[in-house]
Amino acid sequence: MANVIARRSTNASKLERWLGADQVEHISGSMRDWHGKRPILINGVPGAGGVWCGRGGDFVGKIDGGDFMSLADRCVERVDHAIGKVAKRHRMHGFSSLSDLINEVSNFGKRKDFIYQKQGSASVTGGTNTMWRVGTYPPAGNAAANAPGGAALNDATLGAFFFVNPSSPDTQHFVRGDVLSSTAPRTLLLYDRLFEVNKTMSSTTTEAVTGVPTRYQNTADDQPDSADGSFLFIETQAVLGATAHNWTVCTYTDHNGNAATLPLVTGNASNIVNRLDHPVGQWFCPLATGDNGIRTLTQMQCSASVTGTVAFVIGHPIAFMPAVVTNMLTIVDGINTAFNLTRIFDDACLAFLDVNASSTTAATFTGQFVTASG
């Protein structure tokens, strides 16, 4: 990861030509207030080591496409022609070489394919919708467990993708993702859903949370399982009443295990089901100055009594998956292009957010993503 961050800024004109100016601005705008020290991978952008978006909405990493062709052009070409030639140098993580990865996947069955179709609900332009409570595959997840315990989630949780953990000492990594959206541009975020807890909406008193996630709990900086980059969001699971409200004294422990308090988050009166209860353009709760991630949630509080159901959720990002053209499958070969191998930990509860929707139209997402272990 340090090697990725140290790379020069991504060539802006190439990136805009590849993804489209609207898509680039959408992702950049979604990351302007990002707290994590680690950037998030942009799936589908070719380049050894990948292209990433970090704090301030800045892109880093070398892009090998966008000179004469866009991602949409490439998808059409992939339908009609053979795949392009393999990139020569890549970051290997759990693999000694590209040949090692191909051998592991081809001869030892260490590739996993995850198929999905998520039928989204109506949105608000600039609002973020959860895909957790919608089907068809994986099926919709259940409502969150009540405070104080909540629930630490894993791959056996209803709504998650099921997979068999790799045998030790192998580790599992994100290789590629393909996405088709019924409306575009749209951006899915693949994330590990770590923990959720139901908030008592009829109460304005503080409500303690004692449950803790089981992944990304290392308090040391620059470790693969550090909470750096873990984020909190407020998920509407049943329509909220027409009552103005804010999320006030909500407390947490940061990526280093220190106690902290969230800045105030403004909720939405009459917030629709599945939309995050955040202002337009915000898909994660801001953290206290200097904090790079949230390790645990310790307290929730709302300024008013509101009808409806809300869950506080902790997640950890895996990759952005842009859909650039309506009803066209964005086909991206992660080995031959942005070979990055973001780690996916054992028992991960993988899920999606539809980040900062570009319109009010409900989007249906269909596709697959692939992991490999080694």
Regions found by a protein language model. Name each.
Residues 2-14, 18, 22-36, 41-374:
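Polar, enzyme-active/binding microenvironments
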